[in-house]
Design a protein with these regions (language model features):
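Membrane-spanning beta-strands of outer-membrane beta-barrel proteins
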Residues: 80, 118, 165, 213-215, ...
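Outer-membrane beta-barrel proteins
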Residues: 42-46, 112-114, 145-149, 190-195, ...
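Detector for outer-membrane/organellar transmembrane beta-barrel domains
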Residues: 224-361, 365
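Extracellular loop and loop/strand-boundary signature of outer-membrane beta-barrel proteins
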Residues: 70-73, 108-110, 153-158, 195-206, ...
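C-terminal beta-signal and adjacent terminal beta-strands/loops
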Residues: 377-401
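Bacterial Sec-dependent N-terminal signal peptides
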Residues: 1-22
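Outer-membrane beta-barrel "beta-signal"
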Residues: 406-422
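Outer membrane beta-barrel
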Residues: 24-51, 57, 61-192, 212-213, ...
Length: 422
């Protein structure tokens, strides 16, 4: 009840600010958002969030005594928690720049455990000097890729083949004609890098925070006459552990782990047809909702001191959409695990010491055709999404962190999504 009252107060304040617009010509406030409902049925339980609305990959957990996959079970849901409310503010000139800000909420909350809580999606301010721009606050990660993302029915918006991350950041854009060149310092919030001892501390973002330096991202985008071409690179540093333990006792950990990532994309949009192609390649990009991670490369048995090595993963996607009022579209995605950069430490268990987002998945693919109807402020999309993943099975290879055999898990999802914009 208190959350609902807070929401009403927020809406009331926003509407009050809109009413004051005529009294202060230097400030304008616009309310926007949509009501979204979606119903789906799955054939295989998956790695997911938000009451299974945000589905990544089928999650293989083993077989029963009859040899059947335990997670190969049907489930369904109807939910409105992806509905959204936002406020855009345009303010006075400050430091010679046009100023604006955005604050946007949805009901995603703690997406896995309490997905109906009110939460911040975007909260940022912008200083625009025409040829340069400064963005401070939480918004899409630069690897989201501007306007070049797949058009699908699912809330995952193409993840884990498309980067999905909103984070606090300081981004500086250089605007040169049809080009935008950007540099950003990014910190983590909801979408995080993994660490080995997260359960012992209060915040899951500690791996990146304890790495001290922010993630550094550089990107460039060219946009003209329906053509968009972009590329980017990033580097981050994390601290996998706070402490290590060996035969001589428990000690403060000193080791860090650095990783890099790259992206490239192309989009062409005409009157009725849009095509988007995108690719990502990098190490330990779990904070971008990609599969992968890292593992222990060496360990000193006396002090417990460790070094680490990254898994390298890649993803590609192709999205095509035809039509305006009635639209037909399809998204195709494929990704793979190229293994670790260095050999993993063998502690005698038969498997390496690894963490991340399903680093045992060897490759994955998705096919998602859909049909959409757009009428004024209304949009209806019906989609079939098939996602399949090959999990490592059999003998573990310590030289690269991969497996000798594979076990395939496949989910068939049927979804209908309805949106009303305002």
């Amino acid at each position: 009840m208190r959350r609902f009252f807070a929401l009403l107060c927020f809406v009331g304040l926003a509407l009050s600010a809109v009413a004051q617009k005529s009294e202060d010509s230097k400030l304008s406030v616009d309310l926007y958002g949509f009501i979204r409902n979606e119903i789906f049925i799955d054939s295989y339980k998956g790695l997911d969030a938000a009451n299974e609305l945000f589905y990544l990959v089928p999650l293989y957990v083993g077989q029963d005594d009859n040899g059947a996959d335990i997670n190969e079970q049907y489930s369904s849901n109807l939910s409105a928690i992806a509905s959204r409310l936002g406020v855009k503010v345009a303010g006075p000139e400050i430091f010679g720049a046009k100023t604006s800000g955005t604050i946007e909420f949805d009901f995603g909350g703690i997406v896995k455990t309490e997905p109906t809580l009110f939460r911040i999606r975007h909260a940022n301010m912008v200083f625009d000097w025409e040829k340069t721009r400064l963005v401070v606050g939480q918004t899409w990660h630069p690897f989201w890729g501007g306007g070049a993302f797949p058009s699908v029915a699912g809330l995952n918006t193409g993840a884990p083949f498309q980067a999905f991350n909103r984070s606090p950041q300081i981004r500086y854009d250089l605007l040169a004609g049809d080009w935008t060149v950007s540099g950003a310092a990014v910190y983590e919030n909801q979408y995080t890098s993994k660490c080995f001892d997260a359960s012992n501390y209060s915040s899951p973002t500690q791996a990146q925070r304890n790495g001290v330096m922010p993630e550094l991202v550089w990107s460039a985008e060219y946009k003209k006459s329906g053509l968009t071409v972009g590329a980017g690179a990033q580097i981050k540093r994390i601290k996998p552990r706070m402490t290590v333990t060996g035969t001589a006792g428990k000690f403060k950990a000193e080791e860090f782990l650095a990783s890099t990532g790259f992206m490239a994309y192309l989009k062409h949009a005409s009157d009725r047809f849009t095509i988007t192609a995108k690719g990502y390649y990098g190490q330990n990009m779990t904070h971008l909702t990609f599969l992968g991670g890292y593992g222990v490369a060496t360990r000193d048995e006396v002090t417990g001191e460790e070094t680490y090595t990254n898994y390298t993963n890649y993803t590609t996607l192709l999205n095509m959409v035809y039509g305006r009022k009635w639209q037909a579209g399809v998204m195709l995605g494929y990704g793979g695990n190229l293994g670790t950069d260095a050999a993993l430490y063998d502690e005698g268990s038969g498997k390496g010491i690894v963490t991340g987002l399903l680093p045992n998945v060897q490759d994955l693919a998705r096919v998602a055709p859909n049909v959409a109807l757009n009428v004024s402020k209304f949009r209806l999309v019906v989609e079939y999404e098939m996602t399949t993943a090959n999990y490592g099975a059999g003998t573990f290879d310590f030289s690269d962190g991969l497996y000798a055999d594979k076990h395939r898990a496949t989910n068939h999802r049927c979804i209908a999504m309805m949106m009303y914009f305002f």
